């Protein structure tokens, strides 16, 4: 076939391991310095886990690459990865182990995605070539299992909640409903979607927004004339979200007991009198970390 200049098909499968946790966590350890009644002593500092092992990832890849007319190239790639026996700090009972957490092999996580790319010479002569290229990929992460039959686990330090069936990078937050125009109080949605002026941990929900961008790609073009070349390359990320901690502190008001380094929005845009329509509450309200500070971090550069 004259118009088909090249064709490649690649399929691969295999497993790999990961042991990236602190050293010696499989050992039960004791430490000194536990003095009592002027007598030197030891105390159990780590319970250990003799069954601790490597987590395992099974990866499958498929790739199809085609070339047309010696000037257009197209590729399609797909992958599926399943990680089992994940290394995770699992909550433990102090009365049983003397520790709040313990490293264990638990849980299953799956990742899958596709990538499309193409490039071609729009113009190609002896002295001049104009080439364009583009690629786009979509990646999905899902937690399949946790530990001991648990289906959800809150990571209190990151604003994330690990829930079976969801992405491990999905934010778990209260939903901000704005400011009450009558009195300047902050408002939130409860779990049922009703507006309330009470901030409750029990009203947090999975936002559907993740800090890992599912969509990403790039495009570019290049011009070559004899020995000179000019090129431009762009990359983009779509639907990625981050918590704007700077904004949280700058709009905190009296939350942290200080008014240093505050945003001028607190002065100019805050609620001042009944009837004001704004998203900045009255002075004296304690700012809560909710989804008002969850911002779209998509970019093109």
Residue ranges and their predicted role:
Residues 19-33, 149-155, 163-169, 175, ...:
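Membrane-proximal, glycine/serine-rich, low-complexity loop/turn segments characteristic
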Residues 35-40, 88-91, 113, 192-200, ...:
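Active-site-adjacent bridging/hinge elements
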Residues 93-101, 153, 158-159, 173, ...:
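Surface-exposed, low-complexity loop segments enriched in small/polar and acidic residues
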Residues 104, 123-211, 242, 262:
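Conserved small-residue
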